[in-house]
């Protein structure tokens, strides 16, 4: 099928960019950084600018080896803009913009791919649906009357994934990694579909993916391509088209210089933390208590595609198809199954993409919902392509497709009902950091607004079910686009006011009231945003008695940039941000602190260090040892 006219492509891409801006740029930076990981990324990027060290990120005075530097570089460039602290006082615009732009870039790439290589609906019809050997459907308009709308629907199917709506706005590396892996995967398929496409582009993007989150990017792309070429057949000529040997060299030229410099400068510390802990150990062992069952990503798959999960499952089955499994059993495939023209294989490629992510991270010991993000563009392609199927056709009624569509509408209606019944379940929410959340959420009317928009989506999807194929999916999606600025973002702002603002107020009070060189600590609930918004090194300790013992000893002995140890005779007091629950524990009683400020559940104390050390000695005598010097794979 021929590509759409250039003007049509441009109009669709402009519309896609506009919708992406509404979803991911609207009110970006209006809320603070969400604890705990985003402030660590933001503070690391800002420290690059302040320290002039663009090789290794640092946070709270210590090197941070968790990720390669690309996301930190992009954030740092924005923090380096003149006057950034004045026009971006919360710091969340500069730190979140790379995630937002990366997400919009994936939307544009999905749309552009479908605009240049429209896929006929017959590929995902029931009863096999594959062209005969060597066949290419003729009559682009007849085969797919609305490819422009299909392209737009694919972009929105990606952007409206619940996972993307969350990670597309927060300053971590996941959105950028998803973009680099996805853009590389799409560029590989485009090269397979058209030899005129540049062979260097996917390998360059793969190098950037390695600079975003490490060598796992190479493993993922290799798995995707291997699975696709295995099912597609004729792997050797297609693999030669990708030029893997010079391509991998190009990827290495992009990524390896930083790795070499980091290893040369920081040596064993970098190797043990980045390679050993954050890459190998995450795959082979559980880290940070992220132990999940082997089937963890199956419900993540279902939730990430809501409300069109039934469409995704139908498309996945048909794109791979029962015939494909014959190859795994060593049985021959019908010729048509392997002879699918490369430019018509996008659905099969998307299915292999999704399955590769599913299988790889299912095998990993550490499992997190964010690991599913690189699969969401593939899911979006499958949803958009299966939605091209007609409600009625000359071949009869596709009952499976109709059932999948009706189930998708039922899920949208069910979510609308859940929002409408908010007064029944919201009061059951118990969040110690936001005790007034249920009452304020119900009083805001946001749940009612959300219920109306989800109900409208289900209604429009039903009323337009028999209209030209892409319209029905867009009818479902557009009210959900409005749901983001109308209900989701205001809810986010409410949570920030209740949960994030008190920490920012504590940071402001500590900055205003601290004596010269007076150290700052936080015990109990640990919030890295206190470090970011105070601009000071913060000593963090937990709620256990060992936390008090560690704090007293660290004030005397721990030396890190921005934190100079001293005995109580030199620095007699310390500022401590403590939450209400921790402050009520017996071992924090009787220290006679001076309360300087309070906000939410937090208190700012000025603590006499001699009393603190006496209490620490009592706790040590009772069997609570120092633990802060014990080896840890990561700390801040």
Placement of each model-derived feature along the sequence:
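Membrane-embedded architecture of ER/inner-membrane glycosylation machinery
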Residues: 2-3, 200, 318-636
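Membrane-integral, polyisoprenol-dependent glycosyltransferases
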Residues: 1-126, 130-399, 598-601, 605, ...
């Amino acid at each position: 099928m021929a590509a759409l006219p250039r003007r049509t492509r441009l109009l669709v891409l402009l519309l896609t960019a506009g919708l992406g801006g509404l979803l991911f740029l609207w009110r970006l930076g209006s809320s603070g950084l969400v604890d705990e990981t985003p402030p660590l990324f933001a503070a690391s990027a800002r420290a690059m600018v302040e320290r002039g060290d663009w090789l290794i990120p640092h946070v709270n005075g210590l090197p941070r080896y968790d990720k390669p530097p690309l996301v930190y570089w992009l954030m740092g460039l924005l923090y380096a803009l003149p006057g950034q602290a004045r026009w971006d006082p919360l710091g969340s615009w500069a730190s979140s913009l790379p995630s937002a732009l990366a997400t919009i870039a994936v939307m544009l790439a999905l749309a552009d791919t479908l605009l240049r290589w429209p896929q006929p609906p017959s590929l995902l019809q029931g009863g096999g649906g594959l062209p005969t050997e060597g066949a290419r459907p003729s009559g682009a308009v007849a085969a797919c009357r609305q490819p422009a709308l299909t392209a737009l629907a694919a972009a929105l199917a990606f952007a409206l994934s619940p996972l993307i709506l969350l990670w597309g706005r927060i300053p971590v590396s996941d959105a950028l990694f998803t973009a680099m892996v996805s853009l590389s995967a799409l560029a590989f398929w485009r090269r397979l579909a058209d030899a005129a496409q540049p062979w260097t582009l996917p390998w360059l993007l793969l190098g950037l993916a390695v600079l975003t989150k490490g060598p796992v990017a190479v493993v993922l792309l290799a798995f995707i391509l291997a699975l696709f070429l295995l099912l597609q057949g004729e792997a050797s000529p297609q693999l030669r088209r990708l030029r893997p040997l010079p391509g991998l060299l190009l990827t290495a030229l992009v990524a390896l210089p930083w790795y070499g410099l980091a290893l040369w400068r920081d040596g064993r510390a970098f190797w043990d933390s980045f390679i050993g802990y954050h890459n190998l150990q995450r795959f082979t062992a559980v880290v940070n208590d992220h132990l999940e069952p082997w089937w963890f990503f199956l419900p993540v798959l279902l939730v990430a595609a809501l409300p069109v999960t039934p469409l995704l499952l139908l498309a996945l089955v048909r794109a791979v198809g029962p015939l494909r499994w014959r190859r795994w059993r060593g049985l021959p495939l019908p010729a048509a199954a392997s002879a699918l023209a490369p430019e018509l294989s996008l659905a099969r490629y998307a299915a292999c993409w999704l399955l590769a992510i599913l299988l790889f991270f299912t095998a990993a010991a550490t499992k997190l919902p964010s690991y599913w993000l690189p699969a969401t563009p593939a899911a979006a392609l499958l949803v958009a392509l299966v939605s091209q199927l007609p409600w009625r056709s000359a071949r009869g009624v596709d009952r499976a497709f109709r059932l999948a569509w009706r189930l998708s509408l039922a899920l949208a209606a069910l979510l609308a009902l859940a929002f409408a019944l908010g007064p029944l379940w919201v009061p059951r929410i118990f969040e110690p950091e936001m005790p007034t959340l249920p009452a304020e959420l119900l009083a805001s009317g946001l749940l009612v607004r959300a219920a109306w928009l989800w109900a409208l989506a289900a209604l429009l999807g039903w009323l337009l079910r028999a209209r030209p194929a892409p319209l029905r999916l867009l009818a479902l999606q557009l009210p959900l686009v409005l749901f983001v600025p109308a209900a989701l973002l205001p809810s986010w702002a409410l949570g920030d006011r209740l949960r994030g603002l008190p920490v920012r107020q504590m940071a402001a009070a500590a900055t205003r009231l601290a004596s010269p060189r007076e150290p700052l600590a936080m015990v109990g609930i640990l919030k890295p945003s206190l470090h970011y918004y105070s601009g000071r090194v913060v000593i963090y300790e937990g709620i256990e008695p060992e936390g008090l013992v560690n704090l007293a000893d660290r004030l005397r002995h721990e030396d890190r940039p921005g934190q100079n140890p001293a005995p109580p005779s030199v620095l007699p007091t310390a500022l401590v941000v403590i939450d209400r629950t921790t402050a009520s524990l017996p071992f924090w009683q009787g220290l006679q602190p001076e309360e300087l400020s309070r906000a939410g559940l937090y208190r700012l104390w000025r603590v006499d260090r001699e009393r603190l050390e006496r209490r620490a000695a009592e706790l040590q005598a009772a069997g609570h040892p120092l633990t802060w010097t014990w080896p840890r794979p990561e700390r801040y």
